[in-house]
Every structure is written in C-alpha cells, then in structure tokens.
Amino acid sequence: MTNPKKIEMVNDFQQQFAKKMNELGFTYSNIDLYQQAFSHSSFINDFNMDRLAHNERLEFLGDAVLELTVSRYLFDKHPDLPEGNLTKMRATIVCEPSLVIFANKIELNQLILLGKGEEKTGGRTRPSLVSDAFEAFVGALYLDQGLDVVWQFAEKVIFPYVEDDELVGVVDFKTQFQEYVHSQNRGDVTYRLIKEEGPAHHRLFTSEVILENEAVATGQGKTKKESEQKAAESAYSKLKSNNNL
C-alpha cells in the first residue's frame, strides 16, 4: 500500500520542479529522473523504497558532466593558459562550496526530498547534501536533455559567477595542498578512503591523504569528497606550520 505522505511529498515535488524549470527556461521529459536526482537516501529509507532509488548514482554522473562542461568552457575562454592553471580554475569552480553557491542561486535545495530526521537536523541547508543534489540534477539533465542543454544551464547558473570573479574566496584545499607540495618538490599526493560508517541516510566518511607513500593527515565528512577536502586542509596546515612532514 502506497504511503499517503510519500504521495503528498512526490506530488509537491513535481509541482515545484515544473515551476522551477519554467523559471529557468528549460523543458524536460522524464520527471522520474529528476525525482531521483533530488531524492536523498534518508527519504528513500523512510519509505522503504529501492535502495538505489536515491540520487547518488546521478551525482556520480553529474560530477563527470560538470567537469567536462567546465573544462570546455575554460579551454575556450583561456586559449593561452597552460594545463596547470586550467586545472586549478576548474577545481575552484566544481568544488563543494562553489556548487552550493550555484544551487542556492536558484534555490534548488527547496526541491530536495528528505527523510523526516534529516529535515529536522538541517539537512536542507547542509553544504555536502546541497552540492550532491546539484550534481545529481546536472546528471539527470544530461540524460534527459543532452549535453547542449547542460551547457545552456551552465551559461545561466555557473559561468556568470566565474566571469564576475565571484568565486575568488572559494578554497579548494586539495588543489591548494597539491600546489604547495609541488612548490616544495615533494612527491605524489593520493587519497584513500579508510572508513565508512553510520546508517545509509547519515554516513560518515574518513579519508587519509598520502604523501610520498606516508599517511600524513585524515579528514571526516558526510561525503567522500568532503572527507578528502578536510584531510587536504589538515595536511596543508601541518605542512605550512612545520614545513616538514
């Protein structure tokens, strides 16, 4: 038997999503894709839905689509910049704090389907959750409308911020740490997930950053990417203060 609360939430989402897409000037075909894009695992768990009905797979796809789209934009806009500079700029644009800025600009967080507990604990404004939903939406848009429409979306929501230099204060610690290590003529930097714990709707990830085959710092976060950023921030701070790991 279908849960009345679930029906109410889904119907409300579909109405609000249609309104949002109209505001943005885009059409869509497969509403199920977008519903999945905005379905947090806590919502799926609350209503005992298929365990893969949440947005994490679309987030994975959207992450890659965003990187490609931003890479093409930077490649065309800066024909004289070397690869290293382009990589740094891309990292700043697609990192979590920037994605939250883009998502908040168009209030995408209001569309996210959350479980009761996640809603009560402020999940709707949690940066990692909002950035994940933004990536998942991009993944759904790509599958539903294609790369050209993703580009048009980026022209409205992402590129204006880049062109106005509004992301100057955004820090991508992985890039910052990598650059500092390179300036010190140190070895390769890699990241490894060492722990994943907690219920599906409230996971906690722990990652470590490895420099020259030695683990030098760890970080925790609600997502793997967030834990890597925290590890990089810790390692960078340690390296800067000691100038020797």
Curated annotation (Swiss-Prot):
Active site (record annotation): D63, E135
UniProt key word Glycoprotein? no
Q: Region (Disordered): which ranges?
A: 217-245
Which reaction(s) are listed as its catalytic activity?
A: Endonucleolytic cleavage to 5'-phosphomonoester
Q: Which residues bind Mg(2+)?
A: E59, D132, E135
Per the UniProt entry, the Enzyme Commission number(s) are 3.1.26.3
InterPro entries according to UniProt: dsRBD_dom, RNase_III, RNase_III_dom, RNase_III_sf
Cellular location(s): Cytoplasm
State the protein's name: Ribonuclease 3
- Organism of derivation: Staphylococcus haemolyticus (strain JCSC1435)
